């Protein structure tokens, strides 16, 4: 008997996933292939007690801009500037989408950029391999900020996110072997501390609306984890498995919506999964690309879900079959997000701690 994981692993992306038609500034897509992908989304053997009810997004994904990323990641919405920032890790750059005009600006970076975070003074925190830097999009200046402990060769930062008090959590990884040599760090002001070692691919860093729950994934362990989180001290509680995925799909980047549900981009599985706080799968959104990487809510009312994607290591046939691989996508999923937390240059803002 062929399992659902084998079915998806052997999926033939030999035909376009969505039929494309042009509208001003975007490409929209019909979704006839969704019916074919839905069985995989519905039957992959997750350790869940509930029935999974896949449902498509309220509107099909739309391409934003014409750029193609090798490994798009770390989307963050800046509500002050009404723009979305994200990175291309492999072709090192920070990108900015102007929501009003639709224009995309690109700033090349000097080294692999794992992730970014908003800063309370309007700049961006940038996780480079041997330096956590500050980037100012107003004048394109890049300033050294914190030098982490020396990383072994071929190591880099990957996913990162600020907690509700303004600490920056970021994980490192081996860029080639993905061996369990990575470290999860927490940055408070200019003080960087190692919290956890033995990480393969750090991902899915996110926090519940009240900041009392922290989420994290080590992608190659095919699990999403949750922790009680003390915002006053920045200390994680005991680890518990929120949900597990089945190869070939593994958890990549996440965001939390205003209802407290976790949206996770499942790399290699062509889908976004919305998890309830108890780990129950609430919704599955089929994507037109095999490798969604991360997601973030944006727009004037935080009603648009932006999704970064990857085109790396794809054959010519795969690229032809998935013309949106590497694109920034936008869709309406019927819920709103939360404002992105900003890094506090002067240290954690403890007055921002909220009770459940």
Residue ranges of each PLM-predicted region?
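A short beta-strand motif characteristic of beta-propeller blades
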Residues: 60-65, 102-108, 143-150, 191-197, ...
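Hydrophobic alpha-helical segments and helix pairs
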Residues: 141-195
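Flexible "stalk/tail and boundary" regions
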Residues: 99, 120-121, 137-138, 185-193, ...
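A short loop-to-beta-strand structural motif that recurs across blades of beta-propeller domains
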Residues: 93-95, 131, 183-185, 223-225, ...
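Beta-rich, blade/repeat-based domains predominating
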Residues: 67-81, 109-125, 151-167, 195-214, ...
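Conserved beta-strand positions in repeat-built beta-propeller and related beta-rich domains
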Residues: 78-79, 84-89, 125-130, 168-178, ...
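Blade-level signature of beta-propeller repeat domains, shared across WD40, Kelch, NHL, RCC1
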Residues: 300-356
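Short loop/turn segments immediately following beta-strands, especially the blade-tip
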Residues: 227-234, 333-337
């Amino acid at each position: 008997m062929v399992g659902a994981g084998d079915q998806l692993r052997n999926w033939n992306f030999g035909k376009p996933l969505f039929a494309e038609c042009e509208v001003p500034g975007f490409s929209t897509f019909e979704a006839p292939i969704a019916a074919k992908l839905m069985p995989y989304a519905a039957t992959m053997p997750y350790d869940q007690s509930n029935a999974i009810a896949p449902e498509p997004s309220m509107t099909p994904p739309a391409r934003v801009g014409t750029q193609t990323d090798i490994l798009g990641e770390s989307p963050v919405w800046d509500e002050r500037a009404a723009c979305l920032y994200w990175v291309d890790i492999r072709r090192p750059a920070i990108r900015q989408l102007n929501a009003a005009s639709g224009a995309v600006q690109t700033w090349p970076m000097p080294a692999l950029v794992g992730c970014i975070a908003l800063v309370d003074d309007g700049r961006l925190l940038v996780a480079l391999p041997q330096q956590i830097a500050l980037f100012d999009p107003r004048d394109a200046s890049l300033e050294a900020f914190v030098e982490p402990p020396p990383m072994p060769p071929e190591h880099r930062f990957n996913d990162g996110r600020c907690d509700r008090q303004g600490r920056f959590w970021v994980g490192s990884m081996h860029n080639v072997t993905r061996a369990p040599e990575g470290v999860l760090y927490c940055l408070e002001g200019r003080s960087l501390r190692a919290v956890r070692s033995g990480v393969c691919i750090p991902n899915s860093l996110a926090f519940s609306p009240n900041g009392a729950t922290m989420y994290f994934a080590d992608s190659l362990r095919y699990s999403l984890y949750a922790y009680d989180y003390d915002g006053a001290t920045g200390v994680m509680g005991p680890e518990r498995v929120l949900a597990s995925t089945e190869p070939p799909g593994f958890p990549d980047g996440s965001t939390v919506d205003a209802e407290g549900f976790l949206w996770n981009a499942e790399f290699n599985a062509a889908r976004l999964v919305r998890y309830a706080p108890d780990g129950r799968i609430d919704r599955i959104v089929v994507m037109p690309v095999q490798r969604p990487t991360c997601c973030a809510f944006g727009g004037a009312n935080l009603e648009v879900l932006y999704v970064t994607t990857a085109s790396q290591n794809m054959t010519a046939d795969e690229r032809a079959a998935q013309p949106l691989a590497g694109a920034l996508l936008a869709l309406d999923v019927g819920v709103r997000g939360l404002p992105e937390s900003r890094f506090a240059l002067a240290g954690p803002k403890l007055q921002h701690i909220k009770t459940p």
